Amino acid sequence: MSLDSITRTIDESVGGFFEPIATWLGDVIFYAVDINGAEVPLIVAWLVIAGLVFSGWFGLIQFRKFGLALRVVRGKYDEKGAEGEVSHFQALTAAVSGTVGLGNIAGVAVAVSIGGPGATFWMIICGLLGMATKFVEVTLGVKYREMHGDGTVSGGPMHYLPKGLAERFGAGGAKLGKVLAVLASAMILFFGLFGGNLFQVNQSYAQLTAVTGGEDGLMGSSGGALLFGIVIAALVGVVLLGGIRSIASVTSRLVPAMAVIYVAACLLVITVNITAVPAAFERIIDEAFDPVGVAGGILGALIVGFKRAAFSNEAGLGSAPIAHSAAKTRHPASEGLVALLEPFIDTVVVCTMTALTIVIANPPSLSEARAGESIGGVTITSDAFETVLPWFPYVLTVAVLLFAFSTVLTWGYYGLKAWTYLFGRSRASELIFKVLYTVFAVAGSLLTLQTLIDLADAVLFTLAVINIIGLYLLAPVVKRELSSFLQFVRARDRGTDTGTGDAEPETGEDAMTTTR
């Protein structure tokens, strides 16, 4: 039996196994109600309301404290001897590496092809609202993190849900928190294996195949797919052995470089077509509010935009707190402020750049995808760049590979923490997960794009339901932590240090932020 037939059999078997699961879970999670002829998934309302509630509760903190967040990430308020494994900046880049990935490249293309250019506007709105949600969950992640004897840290919803709810509501809260923690861990583990691993490998392989001659090229065979998966799995396995310090060391160098190169390339395409920019913005705004536009007009664009933005920035899912919990700090809210920069970088900056590039270039593959003749994805983005720079798909291939690699690394860490919460923290347990994770990386190069999108979307939003319930219940805790940190900031700015004491009443602008 040839290698091609073996890999084809594996592809068909794995795809046949997961496709029914993806369809069933998608039907449950994306249950929709009909409003004026447009189907509105209830999960979209869940995410929108969460972002609105937290934005109002904390006085639009994503705008009012944006400057403070930048000062914190630069280390202005660092304290010697603070517990943790990595700096604010390293924690941010590790978390960003899990969000700035193929969702920004392939996901945006899918959003524009399904929801039209108007989906871009709603993606930006989702990103801005998600900043407040991210602040809440990361603050909780740091407050209730677990410090181990070897200096390592464990955090995330599997820790702040049981501890926080027990602290606030006693025995009843402890029971509810435990149930939510187990469910959240299962979802993080599931999404880590599929959305954070398989999807990334699948799309990066698709791009590599496209620039090496397509299905008839060097990497077009099943053997090429298997080889690619094995190489990625080996690289991921090596880095995962070093834990969050190793991952942060890689991402703190890789993420800034990737972002700068990618945004610069987008700006080049936009600059070459500078005369088309006003029309592109006009089209985005018009179609965002077009009552009879693409895929259901306003509602269609909003639904697609929010779905893709959530897939990209992960606000409210409980994943980012796992990385941020490792930050060296005595003030949970300080890392929460750092975390609110994530959706801004991921969605407001990078996703917008990708969307503008696609809308301005308007490659033929976009029209084909909107007509339902192809799935689209990373190929649309690649074709958009190629309209200006014929050789750029090769550069994009490198960017896609690096984006995917960093995302797979971070989600490997997230998945490991979920795994050890469920099955115990031991060398044997961790080794089993790492082997399993690398095997899934190999499988990622053998699955179809549509199955991956459906399954990853469903798992992603299931996690959002579980986590946001906990965020609502624990929001008062976050308010107190913010008040305490702002007190510390004022003391530091005055040249004094009041320690970490209890929160005191706020005045002026800070009071407006922390008492709403």
Sequence positions of predicted segments:
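Extracellular loop-to-transmembrane helix junctions
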Residues: N36-K65, S113-V153, T347-M353, D457-G470
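Transmembrane helix-loop junctions in multi-pass membrane proteins
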Residues: W57-Q62, N104-V108, L193-Y205, E215-G217, ...
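Extracellular/periplasmic helix-exit of transmembrane alpha-helices
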Residues: E137-R145, G149, A265-R283, V294-G297, ...
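Helix-loop-helix module between adjacent transmembrane segments
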Residues: F54-S55, V96-S97, C126-V153, P162-N202, ...
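Alpha-helical membrane segments and immediately flanking helix-loop junctions
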Residues: G81-I114, L140-K143, G149-L165, L183, ...
